[in-house]
Amino acid sequence: MLLKQQDFYRSLAARAPGLVERVRRTIEEAERGFTGKREARDGFLWEHSVLVAAQSFRLAKAEKEDPDLAALVALFHDSGKFAGGRYHADDKPEEEESARLAREILEAAGFEMAGIGHVVRALRSLYNSGARRNRLADIVHDADFLAKFGYLGVANFFVKSALRGRNLESAVMDFLGKELTYAAVLPANMRTAAAKKLAAKKSADTLRFYRAYLAELKDAHGLAFRIQTLAVPRPGSRAKKATVSLALPAACGACGGKLLTDLRTEKGLKCEKLEASLRCGSCGEKRSISFCLPELG
């Protein structure tokens, strides 16, 4: 990736020379510690961070916010993902580790304290349903989701699936439901006007690709999945149901029997989560699907 040709890189390099390189080293060292690989090539997480930073820089300009601060929040937004050598551990919000790293690195770089405070607050409010809305966090939220959809987003889905050790079938079973659910509501999930203008096309492109992919998967491998849009009851007094789109097998992969599906939502560490259980009525084989539901509005 041609990092030094990015507008956000040139702007941050003028403001704090060497800062972007230090963030890069921190993220890539953490990812190599997780994967056990020592090659110097760009890691997936750094590549994604650069894409989100570039998009955040552009969105911030359109939204008349500080583009440098938005780019910094974006660069750090996934920096806590491999904390402790684990991928996306769910026992502690990774944004807390990201905020800690951001403060440490920005202070060492001599970045102004007011800017550090803005970055740390934005990171702590990002994907925290209980936190107050934050303009920088909103921009990075939108940029992050825009980067996950469209054709580059589809490519990243398969990279992440490989990183998690999934083959084609298990990637569809375990993770494609989240991609389909979020792609379907992408325009409504955007928090800034500038991002809403970009989201509709990315949503359509993503859904079109996955439908074609599932059709080809059936023809080439005999793996038959159906995309089903389902309404999931929510606990408590909330009348509105959650709508999800799942790629579900047409039949049990072990015996060809009928699959029974149980859907519910529950409160997770950072979000309201879908918990889907699949059980074959004939042989009893079980599978489960779990992911955070989109926050809309």
Residue ranges and their predicted role:
Residues 1-14, 38-65, 76, 128-238, ...:
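Divalent metal-dependent phosphate-bond-processing catalytic cores, especially two-metal-ion Mg2+/Mn2+ enzymes
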Residues 52, 67-90, 94, 98, ...:
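His-Asp-centered metal-binding catalytic motifs of divalent-metal-dependent phosphohydrolases/nucleases
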Residues 19-51, 79-90, 190-194:
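Active-site flanking loop/helix segments enriched in acidic
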